[in-house]
Curated annotation (Swiss-Prot):
Major location (coarse): membrane
Taxonomic lineage of the native organism: Eukaryota, Amoebozoa, Evosea, Eumycetozoa, Dictyostelia
Ranges of biased composition (kind: Gly residues): 433-443
Record-annotated membrane-spanning stretches: 94-114, 123-143, 173-193, 210-230, 254-274, 296-316, 358-378
Lipid bilayer topology: Multi-pass membrane protein
Topological domain ranges for the Extracellular compartment: 26-93, 144-172, 231-253, 317-357
Region ranges (Disordered): 430-511
Glycosylation sites (chain numbering): N51
Record-given protein name: Frizzled/smoothened-like sans CRD protein C
Record's compositionally biased regions (Low complexity): 461-485
Length: 511
């Protein structure tokens, strides 16, 4: 009976497959199948079945249905293997974190907090760094929101559901990313114009004109950022590692066309910069190149990165029908092999090159690090920090610390010296001298104690008494006793009538 049921099931799948092939062969425009459905509750892996009661609401919430079926594409999409997706997110975590801290350093360096002297050049660096910082804090994975490998709860909140604007984290990261990108490339083009004006020695920008730049670029950035919100355009897409605009027309209107304009302006002025350098003499040329080589390198590198992103995206968009066809073939392969044992067949999705996609994703995530190298590690940056109040206060604290440390060390040395002098004065004032042992080897203890009663000895004792006031009375008594005798007496276990007895026997030592 089981074999009969299995045969009927396989026959049913074969019939459905034949029908699907006929339908697809007559429909070249659809992503999958129009007006066709699979058996209820059945979806070949890795597709996910969903019993939808409100299909439109589910689509708006981020469920990506395959054609007219109840099958969902997994999240993240099968455009890339899971291992490739993981490498993309790990790259965003590492490079995004590095660029985030690098851009944060530039923001602090060129902010009014540290840099008191502002020019259009420093303001341009500051604003571009702010834009890059916004991009990095909204990247695929962040240091403060790291998920376990293989988990993408921020972008795939539920099984088979792609995050949408209604998800707070998705909307926040999407807004930050869009605002940061538009701001960064807008100020990049301003920096290209500024470098040309500096080298060509054109009219200097006034503070009023600089204020117009700030208001104009920020206003345009805010419009381009919040405009798509009206149409619920922010969400997690099939080939992204973060939330961004979903529909192609909004991507072009609110991002790629403005990017193309800024890219064109920047490229024109880069050409003018090289022309100005070409016209001047060799001696002056060397001086200008030495002075402006770092800003020029950064502007050219960012131009190449933005240009690659623009060309790559245009290529993907132009070949979208081809990729849709590949997706249809992939799903067809899954359906044909649905009756087979999982793992006994392989369905590969022919999509964009993983390497090209990796370069596309990493291009913008290098900009913070590049900004640090070409704008942060310069003599101008060193001068800004050297003149900052933070550096001066830290220098004062360091000097106070080292001075206190030196004074404490000197006080300790003085105390040790006084202690040694007091001990020496004590023994000298009592007329004791230490001698070596009989065998000539010093033992640290005296084998003989000698007391002098000569006038010279009295003078030495009197000199020592001047250094030790606490022993004056004892010294005077000793001196008087010494003066009453005309010769030295060596005490060897015998008391003298005119002197205090001293004993050299260990058994009879007195304190």
């Amino acid at each position: 009976m089981n074999q009969i049921n299995k045969f009927i099931k396989n026959l049913y799948l074969i019939i459905i497959t034949i029908i699907l092939i006929i339908v697809i062969s007559n429909d070249n425009n659809g992503l999958f199948i129009n007006g066709q459905s699979l058996p209820d509750g059945f979806c070949p892996q890795p597709l996910i079945y969903r019993n939808s009661t409100n299909r439109k609401a589910d689509i708006d919430n981020g469920y990506n249905f395959v054609g007219e079926t109840n099958c969902l594409l997994p999240c993240p999409s099968p455009l890339f293997p899971k291992s490739q997706w993981e490498s993309y997110f790990e790259m965003s975590l590492i490079m995004g974190s590095i660029s985030m801290f690098a851009s944060l350093f530039l923001i602090i360096t060129y902010s009014p907090l540290i840099n008191k002297k502002h020019t259009r050049h420093t303001v341009g660096i500051l604003c571009m760094s702010i834009g890059i910082f916004f991009v990095m804090v909204s990247d695929g994975r962040q240091l403060w929101d790291i998920e376990s490998p293989g988990e993408y709860k921020k972008y795939c909140p539920d099984t088979g559901r792609y995050a949408r604007q209604s998800d707070t984290k998705c909307l926040t990261t999407g807004l930050f990313f869009q605002f940061g990108c538009v701001t960064a490339i807008g100020w990049w083009s301003i920096l290209a114009v500024d470098l040309w004006m500096t080298i060509a020695k054109k009219v200097q920008t006034t503070k009023k004109q600089l204020l117009y730049y700030l208001i104009g670029i920020n206003t345009v950035s805010l419009i381009l950022t919040f405009g798509p919100v009206v149409k619920n355009q922010y969400g997690f897409g099939n080939a992204a590692i973060g939330c961004w605009m979903l529909d192609l027309k909004y991507q072009y209107g609110f991002f790629w066309i403005p990017v193309g304009i800024c890219l064109s302006v920047g490229s024109v002025f880069i050409g003018l910069i090289f022309w100005e350098i070409y016209k001047i003499s060799d001696a002056v040329k060397k001086r200008y190149l030495k002075k402006h080589i770092k800003p020029l390198c950064l502007i050219v590198l960012m131009c190449l990165e933005f240009l690659y992103m623009f060309i790559y995206y245009s290529y993907i968009t132009a070949n979208q029908p081809t990729y849709n066809k590949h997706v249809a073939e992939y799903i067809m392969c899954l359906i044909i092999n649905a009756a087979n044992v999982p793992g006994s067949y392989t369905c590969q999705l022919k999509t964009v090159s993983p390497t090209a996609q990796f370069l596309f994703l990493i291009a913008i995530r290098l900009m913070g690090l590049q900004g640090l190298i070409f704008y942060g590690l310069t003599a101008a940056t060193k001068k800004v920090w050297a003149n900052s109040w933070i550096y001066k206060d830290l220098l004062k604290l360091f000097k106070l610390f080292t001075t206190k440390l030196y004074n404490d060390s000197s006080s300790e040395e003085v105390e040790n010296s006084n202690y040694s002098n007091n001990n020496s004065n004590y023994y000298s004032s009592n007329g004791y001298t230490t001698g070596g042992s009989d065998n000539g080897v010093g033992s640290g203890r005296s084998d003989k104690f000698t007391k002098s009663s000569s006038n010279g000895g009295a003078q030495d004792n009197n000199n020592n008494n001047n250094n030790n006031n606490n022993n004056n009375n004892n010294n005077n008594n000793n001196n008087n006793n010494n003066n009453n005798n005309s010769s030295s007496l060596e005490i060897s276990g015998v008391e003298s009538n005119n002197s205090t007895p001293r004993v050299n026997s260990p058994d009879n030592l007195q304190p």
